[in-house]
Structures are given as C-alpha cells and as structure tokens.
C-alpha cells in the first residue's frame, strides 16, 4: 500500500461505523466512507468535537451539518497550498491519499534533469497539477467543470505558482485527447483520475470499467519519444490496480519498456495504526 508520511495539515484520526474522523488543518470533520464496515473499539475523543459532519439522506443525497465549519479554509502539504470547501457528495476538494502519488512523480520530474511536459486529465482541483508544476514541469490541466478549474487556479496561487507554465482547459477529457492526437502534440508525463461513473453531454452513461481501455489506448498515443511516466488512478471497486497495470503493459510498456507498479492508496489511522484503503493506482515509468 502506498501512503504519504508527510502530511501535517491532514490526519485520519479514527474510523468507525461507516465514518471517518478527520483533521483538516484545525478543523475536525466526520464523513461517510463505505469501506469502513467495522465498529471502532477505542473511540477518539474528537468524535464529539466535529466542526462539520456530512450526513447521507435516505434519498441517496446528503448535506453538511455545520457546527463551526467555515465556507472555506486553507491547508498546506509541504510547499503546496490548497483551499478547501464543504462540497456536495461529502467532498472537500482534495483527496489526501493522492499525496503518495504526488511525491512519486515529483521525484521523477526533479531527477530527470530535463524539461518535462505533463498532461493531467480529469484534473479536479489540481493537487497533481501543482505538485508537478512545483517539481518543475509544465502542465496542461483538463477538467470538464469550470468551477473546479477555477479552484485549481486558486490552489496554484496558494502554492506560489500563479506564473508557472500551467495551461487550464475546461473540456471533455476524451474529446481533448482526440484533438491533441490530431494536432500532433505529445507529453512526457500523463496523469489520469477518471470518475467511476458519469454522463456525457448527450446524456450517455459513462462507466469506467467499460471505457478505461479506450481511454488509455488513446492517451498513450500522446506520449513523447522519451516519456517519463504514466499514472492511472481509480476509485472504482470493480476495477483492480492489476487490471489497469495490464492495460499499461499492453499500451505503454510494450512500446517503451520501463517498469510498472500497481497498488492501493491508503491513509494511516492515528487511533489504531491500521490503514484505510482509498482507491488504487497503476504506475508506468521509465528508469
């Protein structure tokens, strides 16, 4: 399991009964998590001091119960800054487990000693974007949500990257990739974090299990002659990291050689010392 030991502003304090108890900066949140199927034995005292709780409704939605929870606040991960907001579907605008991936590809970028161009697809609020840019890469950040891309720009500013070579694109990621292929553009590093489920502009249903093969096949065509890495993330339970790594084996390693790693991402629980699984990643990289 991959996890980051470098968080100071985030902490998974405890887990129990389908919920996480988390510290985000100075604020304590309780959020639902379907992976937490156990009942806690030793309850952390902060369970009774939450600033915000996300409660699911019987209709399938949910809402934040705010005690002392502001509309927004800021945290740091090393020299990276992030603005957080209580959002729909229990989210805050950041997935802290992804810091393990940020550390990994940032090291590759720094050690390459050459200009690196990165494409970040389904880039959300730009955690990976600012990590890559801070490591010295130029980045093309693509997400279909205008509001989310605006928050990514805020995170870049908080990270001291307002003038960094980051290009923000509000677009459907697959259509953008297809256009980049026609334009003949190439990238040294590719990051993709596709959603498990979605609907296209015409109302068509999009499922990751049915689309990941085509998505990787298309995007692999954008790799440069000397690529550095290709990272695929998944929060889809039915799509194992080994399945994604097999696709990277066929579409990337077969052409370039290199190494492939596959594993789960996790967060260490302070109260128990155990790890909470938080999705999976498959990594290809060229040594």
Task: Mark where each language-model region is.
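S-adenosylmethionine
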Residues: 173-253
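Conserved class I S-adenosyl-L-methionine
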Residues: 114-124
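Conserved SAM-binding motif I beta-strand of class I
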Residues: 138-143
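S-adenosyl-L-methionine
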Residues: 145-191
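Conserved alpha-helix/loop element of class I SAM-dependent methyltransferases that forms part
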Residues: 96-114
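C-terminal catalytic and target-recognition region of SAM-dependent MTase-like enzymes
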Residues: 227-287
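Conserved SAM-binding loop of SAM-dependent methyltransferases across substrates and taxa
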Residues: 125-137
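Non-catalytic substrate-recognition/targeting regions of SAM-dependent transferases
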Residues: 6-22, 29-96, 103
